[in-house]
Regions:
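Sec-dependent N-terminal signal peptides
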Residues: 4-13
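Low-complexity, intrinsically disordered regions enriched in charged/polar residues
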Residues: 11, 81, 124-125, 215
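C-terminal segment of classical bacterial N-terminal signal peptides
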Residues: 14-18
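Acidic, serine/threonine-rich low-complexity disordered tracts
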Residues: 19-107, 138-225
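Hydrophobic, well-structured mid-protein blocks that either form specific transmembrane helices
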Residues: 92-132
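Alpha-helical transmembrane spans
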Residues: 132, 136-138
Length: 225
């Protein structure tokens, strides 16, 4: 029987630890991006400790071509900063088919809320929100996430689908399989969250992400350093 994640979280001690602790020994995580099983780009996260801050930088680039002509492209640069387990700032700039999107976020300690200036949302958000990036396994805990492209706040549900073994780049992983989807079923299709996620609990790493939108898209974990 499928079980919702809220049950799993009570039982799994790994989820209860500060998430930055899991990544302090990594310098980067590299994911390759595929569409219909053809590589189209990559998403790279780098991790750095500076005094009391934990800093995560992301570069994501991909390009979809049809008959040699680029029909869709993404170029993203973003930086997350944490003190302990608390996100204190996030900034990103995205060019989607040359259209600019952005997010400037800070944590207001007095209000204990995020203040967001984004291309699609300007306002406050609860501090329990996380940035919707695939390096962070806490995306499987939260009820809401902040779009790393535009700053919009999205409500989500998580469903546990089962345990599996998968193989990527000649490596085999024991994973837990989840579905992440929008809470509001009435959202337009292009605004809905609908992802399948394969998570390695022992390593506290998301191994693969897949979704369908005019084809099958996948983010596959290639390298950890």
């Amino acid at each position: 029987m499928r079980k919702f994640l809220v049950i799993l979280l009570v039982l799994s001690p790994l989820f209860l630890l500060a998430h930055t602790d899991h990544y302090k020994n990594y310098s980067n995580i590299e994911m390759e991006i595929f569409k219909d099983d053809e590589k189209i780009g990559e998403s790279i996260f780098t991790f750095k400790k500076e005094e009391n801050k934990f800093i995560v930088k992301n570069t994501t680039n991909f390009e979809v071509k049809l008959l040699g002509v680029t029909v869709f492209s993404i170029n993203i640069r973003g930086t997350e900063e944490y003190i302990g387990d608390q996100l204190i700032s996030f900034n990103s700039e995205t060019f989607q088919n040359n259209k600019r999107k952005y997010v400037n976020l800070i944590f207001d300690e007095k209000k204990e809320k995020f203040i967001i200036d984004g291309s699609s949302y300007k306002g406050e958000a609860d501090k329990e929100n996380i940035i919707g990036h695939w390096w962070n396994h806490r995306i499987l805990q939260t009820e809401t996430q902040i779009s790393p492209l535009s700053g919009s706040v999205k409500r989500q549900n998580i469903e546990f689908l089962g345990k599996e073994k998968i193989k990527l780049y000649n490596k085999e992983y024991d994973v837990e399989h989840f579905r992440l989807f929008s809470t509001d079923p009435n959202l337009p299709d292009n605004k809905k969250l609908n992802f399948e996620i394969w998570y390695d609990k022992k390593k506290a790493l998301i191994i693969k992400v897949a979704y369908k939108r005019m084809g099958l898209w996948e983010y596959r974990l290639k390298k950890i350093q």
